[in-house]
From Swiss-Prot:
Chain ranges of the TRAM domain: 373-441
Underlying gene: rimO
Lineage of the organism: Bacteria, Pseudomonadati, Pseudomonadota, Gammaproteobacteria, Lysobacterales
CDD domains per UniProt: Radical_SAM (cd01335)
Protein name per the record: Ribosomal protein uS12 methylthiotransferase RimO
Sequence positions that bind [4Fe-4S] cluster 2: 147, 151, 154
């Protein structure tokens, strides 16, 4: 082995099960090119796998941590005593990281942070953030699979199964790797983002030496620690969604909610098996805007659902007038094989569905145009997606890729810009979809953060 390999010291305490945990960690360390050394003074960092079963084991573990701190100073603690991180940090506040038993990934993340593995061009063919099909500067972050709802127009549960939430620490570590690899925007997706953690009873996990619940608000709080935009998609309108809006007001995550309301008629919503308290929905949208005045609310709707009357469609148009949503997508109802809505009576004729869809989109186009026009004269922080000659295409905080509008920067030949760069743009024009403006000179906007590249 080359003397240039990073060196890890290892102390394993406790029962045979803990010994197996140590073996797994050591195996991973060796597979990544770390040398395992027998003494504190020859180690670049020390891992202590602790026991906490009885008082004497706790004492032995704390003594081992203390010895490693005294003789080396760079110590990562894992194992059973790691389930009581406050006890460890009270005795040794300067340990690098603390994790519980079987949390191999946290140990490896802590080692990587303290002592990055040596780059091997013959082995490191895949970046640690994986292979992505999106541009380098944004990425989708999937937090769960499946869905527990039984919306009558949808067959997702039969295709993808019931809700299965990813552990919050796993999600946060993936997000951290993505940002470290140059991602500037994280787009949180799932079938039902609001239900995150319900299936695991909001289990608590450790990340960066702090406990996080597997829950939407806690996830947002963790993601807000990263130097990137965080955008929430597919948010089912549960009451606890209100908890994340203050984080938007504090600029910790983007003031943006993609929340599918689907309709505004209580009867149609019941037929869809969706929440039906439209008055409360309007109150909530108004309250979100009081808390976070810059919030963008995007939604999707279905027109021509079986049994929809002209009066109920008019209710939907009235809802658009009152809600003044920023971005809206709509679909004419189309039967999906296996959906229970197919069995509902009073199917709406195709020509009526298309006529209603056109009226719906015309109404929303007027609303969107007015809301965009109100931004003329403002300065919007934007993320540059593409540069073509003297025109750059970017997105503001209000614009998700592919589904929302764009910001056309018209002086890209006069101001140095790069794809994936944040830039402040003074808005000069608008239409019903997009904004147009000029990038401000670098001296008048925040410096580009090179650490993200």
């Amino acid at each position: 082995m080359s003397q240039l390999n990073p060196k890890v010291g290892f102390v394993s305490l406790g029962c045979p099960k803990a010994l197996v945990d140590s073996e797994r960690i050591l195996t991973q360390l060796r597979s990544e090119g770390y040398d395992i050394v027998p003494s504190y003074d020859s180690a670049d960092v020390v891992v202590v796998n602790t026991c906490g079963f009885i008082d004497s084991a706790v004492t032995e573990s704390l003594d081992a941590i203390g010895e490693a701190m005294n003789q080396n100073g760079k110590v990562i603690v894992t194992g059973c005593l790691g389930k009581r991180p406050e006890q460890i940090r009270e005795a040794y506040p300067n340990v690098l990281a603390v994790s519980g038993p079987q949390d191999y990934q946290s140990v490896m993340e802590a080692v990587h942070e303290a002592l990055p593995p040596k780059h091997d061009p013959f082995v490191d063919l895949v970046p640690d953030y994986g292979i992505k099909l999106t541009p380098r500067h944004y990425a989708y972050l999937k937090i769960s699979e499946g869905c527990n709802h039984k919306c009558s127009f949808c067959i997702i549960p039969s295709m993808r199964g019931k809700l299965v939430s990813r552990p919050v620490d796993e999600v946060l570590r993936e997000a951290e790797r993505l940002v470290r690899g140059g991602v500037r925007e994280l787009l949180v997706v799932s079938q039902d983002t609001s239900a995150y953690g319900v299936d695991v009873k909001y289990a608590e996990k450790m990340w960066r030496n702090k406990a996080y619940q597997t829950r939407l608000k806690a996830l947002c709080e963790g993601l807000s620690e990263l130097d990137a935009w965080v955008r929430m998609h597919y948010v089912y309108p549960y009451p606890h969604v209100d908890e994340v809006v203050p984080l938007m007001a504090e600029n910790r995550i983007l003031p943006y909610l993609d929340i599918p309301f689907q309709h505004a008629s209580p009867r149609i919503l019941r037929l869809m098996k969706r929440p039906g308290a439209v008055e409360k929905t309007l109150e909530r949208v108004q309250n979100w805007r009081r808390i976070a005045p810059d919030i963008t609310v995007r939604s999707t709707f279905i027109v021509g659902f079986p049994g929809e009357t002209e009066a109920e469609f008019e209710e939907l148009l009235s809802f658009l007038d009152e809600a003044q949503l920023d971005r809206v997508g709509a679909f004419a109802y189309s039967p999906v094989e296996g959906a229970t809505a197919n069995d509902l009576p009073d199917a709406v004729p195709e020509e009526v569905k298309q006529e209603r869809l056109a009226r719906f989109m015309e109404k929303q186009a007027q609303i969107s145009a007015a809301r965009l026009e109100a931004k003329i004269g403002t300065v919007q922080q934007c993320l540059v997606d593409a540069i073509e000659g003297d025109i750059a295409v970017a997105r503001s905080k209000a614009d998700a890729p592919e589904i929302d509008g764009l910001v056309h920067i018209q002086n890209a030949d006069q101001v140095p810009l790069r794809v994936g760069e944040f830039v402040d743009v003074e808005i000069t024009e608008s239409d019903e979809h997009d904004l147009y403006g000029d990038a401000l000179p670098a001296a008048t906007r925040p410096a580009f953060d090179l650490k993200m590249l």
